[in-house]
Amino acid sequence: KHKFENGFEFEIKIKKGSGAFVCGEETSLMASIEGVRAMPRPKPPFPANSGLFKKPTNINNVETLAAVSSIMRDGAASYAALGSEKSKGTKTFSLAGKIQRTGLIEVEFGMKLGDIINSIGGGCADGRKFKAVQTGGPSGGCLTIEHMDLPVDYESLGSVGTIIGSGGMVVMNEDSCMVDVAKFFVSFTENESCGKCVPCRMGTQHIHAILEKITSGKGEMADIERLKKIAFTMKQSSLC
């Protein structure tokens, strides 16, 4: 317990999770803390009304709480002076893949993608040509050389069909097979699917099978339409 001068007390409890990917979704995380199987819940009700143990809940990740401490210390105006017009502040990204300098970086929202890849990351390793960068984790999308002038913020990435997500950036070079990359991430989501939503549970399996078929040299143009149809159904029908 921590006691302040005004007599306010609160308890901090640390609960260890098993690292399930689905627990990145807030209602799944609360289910895990409650001791039941981690599965997403329909919203509404939202956590602010009915969250952990059906009580009003303020649920945020560590990066948000770190930003709150900065705002409390330096004021909201100081924090809002950083970033882009709609995405204020900074974001931590994890640079990985075929890039010279990997690691964690913190940049202002609105920095151009090319500046992150080339100025901070040093460009592709071994003098290879840049092909794409996958953003937003397994559920994100890929950006190519034509997106180098794109500001990295929520609105700009959303406008081209990808997300910031947890801040992952995996760089691919000219030697990378994008179908293999897609198959790798789909294999992960297939294994990590909680199984609650049929479109996700079955869709990831079907997409993985189609990508396996393509990479084995047996693909056909009709497979592309099947992939689009399954992906659309999953996006429209799955909870998270």
What are the residue ranges of the model-derived segments?
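Terminal amphipathic helices with adjacent charged low-complexity linkers/tails
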Residues: 1, 10-12, 124-159
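Hydrophobic alpha-helical positions that pack around
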Residues: 1-109, 121
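Ferredoxin-type iron-sulfur electron-transfer modules in oxidoreductases and energy-metabolism complexes
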Residues: 1-6, 145-239
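A generic structural signal for well-ordered coil/turn residues at beta-strand boundaries
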Residues: 8, 89, 101, 129, ...
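Short amphipathic, charge-patterned alpha-helical segments
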Residues: 109-125
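Extended, hydrophobic alpha-helical segments in both membrane/secreted and soluble proteins
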Residues: 113-116, 129, 193, 207
